[in-house]
Amino acid sequence: MRMEKIDENTIRVLLENDDLEERGITGLDLLSNHKKIERFFYSILEEVDQDHVFANNDAVTFQVLPNEQGLELLISKNLSNLDLNKAQSEMVQGKDGITEYIKDQLLKRDTASSEDDEEDDEIESYLNQADNPTKQVVLGFDTFEDWIALAQQLHIESGVSNLFVYKHQYYAQLVFFLENTTETFVQDDLAVANEFGHKTNYTADFLSEYGQRVMENSALELTRYYFKD
């Protein structure tokens, strides 16, 4: 971990993947484990703020910039009202909202992007039309590593994938758009999926209600991106 004091109100912390691993932080934690990430960020603040100048300030903000090497964390205090208003679209103040901001950054989702919204709307519209045939399967995984291994092997040509966490267990919903593929391709993909996961009685609706959806629509692609070989 490297720390640089940019000025009296801003500290930059560079955390490499090894630093995250040493602290027991995984990519999935950054997406789903609210309490763990909350503790993690404030533990970093405690490490670098030995004089407690930042920790004793109620208006501390965090800006998270993920990269392939790890994370860049900017910690700021004493922002003016103008700067604070400007920063709130880019930064997270205090504990509330930290995980949601990281999730947006890690999934490279621009919440103001109409293109992303339109794509999500198109997928939702397709799934909601009864005359659009789909095949849906939900699989459970013994470990997150099993899910990563599947993501590195399985490339769905026409469909979506969602990743859920429920009671510390990982589940994936695979949805195949049958209009744009063949039964043979679907069966081949399912054969690959069954090598790494196992069938479960849980439905996607159940997991959405009682668990947490941590990757939506492109879970396979996102996992491949963030968990490379």
UniProtKB/Swiss-Prot annotation:
Coiled coil feature spans: none
Database matches in Gene3D superfamilies: 3.30.70.1950
Disulphide bridges, residue numbers: none
One example GO MF annotation: protein-macromolecule adaptor activity
Pfam families: MecA
UniProt note: domains: The N-terminal domain probably binds unfolded/aggregated proteins; the C-terminal domain interacts with ClpC.
UniProt function note: Enables the recognition and targeting of unfolded and aggregated proteins to the ClpC protease or to other proteins involved in proteolysis.
Assembly: Homodimer.
Family in the record: Belongs to the MecA family.
Protein name: Adapter protein MecA
Organism whose genome encodes this protein: Latilactobacillus sakei subsp. sakei (strain 23K)
